[in-house]
From Swiss-Prot:
GO biological process terms, semicolon-separated: translation
Organism lineage: Bacteria, Bacillati, Actinomycetota, Actinomycetes, Mycobacteriales
SUPFAM superfamilies found in the cross-reference section: Ribosomal protein L4
Renumbered residue ranges of the record's region Disordered: 42-100
GO MF, one example: rRNA binding
Role this protein plays: One of the primary rRNA binding proteins, this protein initially binds near the 5'-end of the 23S rRNA. It is important during the early stages of 50S assembly. It makes multiple contacts with different domains of the 23S rRNA in the assembled 50S subunit and ribosome.
HAMAP family: Ribosomal_uL4_B
Coiled-coil regions, chain positions: none
Keywords on record: Ribonucleoprotein, Ribosomal protein, RNA-binding, rRNA-binding
Assembly, per entry: Part of the 50S ribosomal subunit.
Organism: Mycolicibacterium paratuberculosis (strain ATCC BAA-968 / K-10) (Mycobacterium paratuberculosis)
Protein name: Large ribosomal subunit protein uL4
Amino acid sequence: MALKLDVKAPGGKVEGSIELPAELFDAPANIALMHQVVTAQRAAARQGTHSTKTRGDVSGGGRKPYRQKGTGRARQGSTRAPQFTGGGVVHGPKPRDYSQRTPKKMIAAALRGALSDRARNGRIHAITELVSGQTPSTKSAKAFLGALTERKQVLVVIGRSDEAGAKSVRNLPGVHILAPDQLNTYDVLRADDVVFSVEALRAYIAANTGTPEEVSA
C-alpha cells in the first residue's frame, strides 16, 4: 500500500500531497543487509595510505652493535631490530585497499529498507523548496526545518540545481545535503529525519521505478 505525504511550502502551508511507492518506501528492513552495506561503504571511504617501516626499511643498523660473545648480554645483530628504539615495526600497517565488492542489488535493497524504516515511523518529509525565491536564507531554512522536525540530525535531499537551498542549509549543524542520485543507506540511517524536495523525490522515484509521481493538490 502506497504511503501519502503532505507537501509543505516554506511558510508551513500544505501545497498538496505525493504518494510514496510501496516498493521503495514500504519494503522490509533487513538489518543484516543494511549493516553489511554500511560497513562496505565506510570501508571504501578509508584512504588506506597508512604505512610503517620494517627493519629492512629503516635506515642504518648495518653494523653489529657489539660482539657476539663475552659480554653477558643477549646476542644482537642490528640496532634496527624491533626491540630497539628506532627499530622497525613488526606487522605494522601497509598501504592497502579496504573497499569491498557489494552487488548493486544489495545496495539498492538496503537503501529501500532504510527509507522504508524512516517512512513507517513518520520521519520522511516532502517540501516544495527550502527557501522562497532564489535568495539563500539560512535563518528561513533553519526555521522551516525546525517546524518540520525537532530532531537534530536531518538529511536534506534536493536537486542539484537548487543552489539557493543548498547554500541556505550547508552551514547548519546536524544538516547533511545530498542530491537524489547520491542517496545511500549510511546517510539515511545516520539521519533522524529525511527531508525531500518534490523535485528530488520525483527524481529518485523515477530512477528506481521508471514512473515519476505527480503531486496532487
